[in-house]
Every structure is written in C-alpha cells, then in structure tokens.
C-alpha cells in the first residue's frame, strides 16, 4: 500500500514537471471526463455517407482522403462538405491544385463563393505550405486539397520533360503530412485530400490499383473513402445523373468497411430527397401500401407522400419541413443527432 502511494506521488510530480515544461494539456489521463469529448464532425452533405462514417460526417481535427477513378464524384463530395461547413458558420478553403474548379457548379451545390477561400498554387510545396498556414491559424474549419495527383514538386516543374524524378511527390507528401498532422488535431480543422487511382505494373495477385503520392497519406488519414461510379439515373431516355457507391475503407473513429449509396444529379450534386426516400423506406420511417407511400409525423398524423418513388421525391422537395423531420428520425435511429438538431423535435412534441 505504501509502495503504491509512493508510485502515485512520483507520477504526480513527473506529470507536474511535464506540464510546467511543455504546457497544460501536454499529457493527460485518458479516462478523465474533462478530456474525453464526443467526436465533433462536419456533415458530408449525404445522409447515407453520414451513416456509413459512423459518427455523422468527417471528424474534426483529422485528415480525410477521398479517392477513386476519374469522374466518380470526388470533387462533388468535397464541395458538399464545404457547403455544410459554411452552413454551420465555419470558414472553408479550397486548394485547387488541378486548376479546374467550376464556380457555377460549386454555387449550385450550395457553396457560398463570397466567403470561400481559394488558392491555385504553382507547385506542390506552395500548396502544402498554404494548407499548413491555414491549419495553424486555428480559424479555418475545412480545407480541401484537390487533388494529390496534381501536387507536382517544384523540382519536377523546373526540370526537363524527360527527367527521371523518382519518389519526389511521395517524399513531399510524407514531409508535409508530418508537419500538418499535429497542428490539425489542435486546430479542430478537417483537411480533405482528393486522390486519383493508378495501376501498379506487374501485379499478379490482388488489386493492381493504388493511389498517388506514396504511402504517407494512407497512414495519416483517419478516414479514407473509396468512391465508385454506379449505374446511370434516367428520366425517360435522358441520363440525368448517376449512382455513386462509397466504401469507408479506413476509419479510426468508428467501425470501417461500411458502404453507402448516394445519387448525384448532373449540375446539381447530391439529391438529398432521393436519398431520404430510399433510406426512409429501408428504415421503416416511410411506409408503403401498394404503390403509395406514407409518413406518420411526430404528432401522429399520417401524410400521403405520393404514388411511386418519383412522386415521393417531388413531394419531399416541395415540403422541406417533412423532409427535415424524416431526416431527423433517420439520424436518431443511428444515434447521429447533434444537440442542435434535437431541439426542433422536442418543440414538436411539446406542441
């Protein structure tokens, strides 16, 4: 007993010296209730992907990678995240390494262009230095880097076209992420990197696909989303969009390998009401009787949503209050409701 007290006393003195030398919070007891906080997130803009992440969105203070083939919806997901961050009153930045941002499309997705910070860097070092400065400022909530493949090292740009520059980009990413990872956690910002897929030559077994920029991003990313283009969405004979299949291949804040299916309409982005209809039916929030669909409100009133899926989607677009109520009910089922979203529900019940 005396030995345990002595150990405790020595430990307390050691902790005190560490805090004096390195500042308060440099070391802490994990079980201390004042230190353990629920994971804060920025919503993805898709309720299906919010559910798949397990925490309701992209975790703050972490690095996220969204990767997939060309035209699979990576930039669209990143822009939706920016729109969600801005809705929460946050500051967002877009590092356009590809020099391909379409402002009109971004605006259609709900991005406030007047408050969006944008940079079109000349080379990879400049892009990552800008990211580091924004993170260290502590006032930027979301930073999107589009894309890792376009982060060309300065030496490669200044060299001749045929010069062999082995591993330059991988070394650049490794060095930058070592700097950024620590400051991201303190700033509570989310840094999203979009990335492209390349083929490994000579692979006989397993997947030949890999992402650009070396292995560093795979290690430092808390969450990695694999995005794949699915079947086309048609209105009559016209193709108006496509299904996007998302798989959470890495997740440090919730169980990984969950999948989600979302729907992107060309020129408009993710169709929220289309998602609500499909998830609502799957979760029993929306009931079906024959070809008609119904929803029972929090007040106990049964509302007819329409006959056939397309009419239900149109009804939800025209009645945003019911759409929001259905969304809250779905999120509640998965335990994803934030405190700010619980208040309207309580108000409805009290009335």
From Swiss-Prot:
ATP binds at residues 68-75. It is found in: Cytoplasm. PROSITE patterns: RECA_1 (PS00321), RECA_2 (PS50162), RECA_3 (PS50163). Gene3D superfamilies: P-loop containing nucleotide triphosphate hydrolases. Pfam families: RecA (PF00154), RecA_C (PF21096). Its main location: cytoplasm. Keywords: ATP-binding, Cytoplasm, DNA damage, DNA recombination, DNA repair, DNA-binding, Nucleotide-binding, SOS response. GO terms for biological process: DNA recombination; DNA repair; SOS response. Transmembrane segments: none annotated. GO terms for cellular component: cytosol. One of its GO terms (molecular function) is ATP binding. Belongs to the RecA family. Can catalyze the hydrolysis of ATP in the presence of single-stranded DNA, the ATP-dependent uptake of single-stranded DNA by duplex DNA, and the ATP-dependent hybridization of homologous single-stranded DNAs. It interacts with LexA causing its activation and leading to its autocatalytic cleavage. This is Protein RecA. It comes from Thermotoga neapolitana (strain ATCC 49049 / DSM 4359 / NBRC 107923 / NS-E). The lineage of its organism: Bacteria, Thermotogati, Thermotogota, Thermotogae, Thermotogales.
